[in-house]
Amino acid sequence: MHILGLPTDIFNVYPASIKYKTYQARWQIGDIYVSGDARKTEDNPQGLGCYLVMTGRGCDDIFRILDSRNCTFGDMFKHCERRYGQDNFHFTRLDIAIDDKNEKPFFTIEQIKKKCEKEEFISNSEGYHFDESKFDDFDTAKTVYISAGKSGLSYRFYDKDKEVCSKHNKTLDEVGSWKRTEMQLRDDKAHAFAMTFKDRPQIGRAHV
C-alpha cells in the first residue's frame, strides 16, 4: 500500500485469485483492489509482487487523495519507479479519457458513427461496432467502438451526459453536454504511455 499512500488497516482483506496469476488474497477499499500474497513458485520463491486494479471511481478517489497532497498520477508512477526499479513493474491496462463539455460538442457520437460507416478513419484495426440503448421516449444513448477491446489500442466514443443522467436520475439540462472519448491501452502501449506521462504530466492537464 506504499504506492497508494494508504494505511493497510482500512482495507477489507479476503481470499481471492486471478486467472493465470498466483495471488491468493485481495485487499479492497471501495473500487480499489490490490491482489497479493502470491504463492511461492520456482520463478518467485519469496512470493513477492502485487496486482493493483482501480475502476473509474477508484481512480477518482486516488486522484482526490493525490491532489490533496499536491501530487499527480505522474508522481505516483515516479514513486513506482523509485521503489521497484524501472524493470520490476508494468502496466497491463490504462484507460485515457478526453472529455468534451462544450455546449456545442466538437463532434457527436452520431457523427463518429457516420465516419466509421464511410470508413473515414485510420486505425490499427478496421473493426468497429456500435451500441445503442434507450435513453427516453425520443432519444437513445450511443457508443462507438473502434478496434477490439483486447487489442493494444482501442477507442470508445459515447454520450457521457446520458450515462450520468441514467445513473444519477438527472436531466440533460442539469448535466449539460458531455461527450467522452476513451483510449484503452494494454500492456506495452499502456506502460509506454504511463512512463511518458510520468515525465510529461502536462499532457493530461487539459483533462484535469
Residue ranges and their predicted role:
Residues 1-207:
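Structured, helix-rich domain cores that form ligand/interaction pockets
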